[in-house]
UniProtKB/Swiss-Prot annotation:
Disulfide bonds, paired cysteine numbers: 3-22, 15-39, 43-54, 55-60
Other remarks in the entry: Is classified as a P-type cytotoxin, since a proline residue stands at position 31 (Pro-31 in standard classification).
Family: Belongs to the three-finger toxin family. Short-chain subfamily. Type IB cytotoxin sub-subfamily.
Keywords linked to the UniProt accession: Cardiotoxin, Cytolysis, Disulfide bond, Hemolysis, Hypotensive agent, Secreted, Toxin
Job of this protein: This protein lyses red blood cells, has cytotoxic activity and induces hypotension, but is not neurotoxic. In addition, it induces direct paralysis of the muscle fiber.
Tissue: Expressed by the venom gland.
GO molecular function, one term: toxin activity
Compartment(s) of residence: Secreted
Annotated source species: Hemachatus haemachatus
GO biological process: killing of cells of another organism; regulation of blood pressure
Protein name: Cytotoxin 2
Key word Disulfide bond present: yes
GO terms under cellular component: extracellular region
């Protein structure tokens, strides 16, 4: 699995074994900019300020 790992979406890396999800964290308020991307083994929970999106395909975040 390859996930974007920087705020700019064209940089990606191959996830280590066991981390089979990509995630993207974005601010819930305008501007809804991505603040963190990467690989994870479990989808982090969204919070009051941050929305989390997880997916299982290459570069989907």
């Amino acid at each position: 699995l390859k996930c974007h790992n920087k705020v700019v979406p064209f940089l990606s890396k191959t996830c280590p074994e066991g981390k089979n999800l990509c995630y993207k964290m974005t601010l819930k308020k305008v501007p809804k900019i991505p603040i963190k991307r990467g690989c994870t083994d479990a989808c982090p929970k969204s919070s009051l300020l941050v929305n989390v999106m997880c997916c299982k395909t290459d570069k989907c975040n």
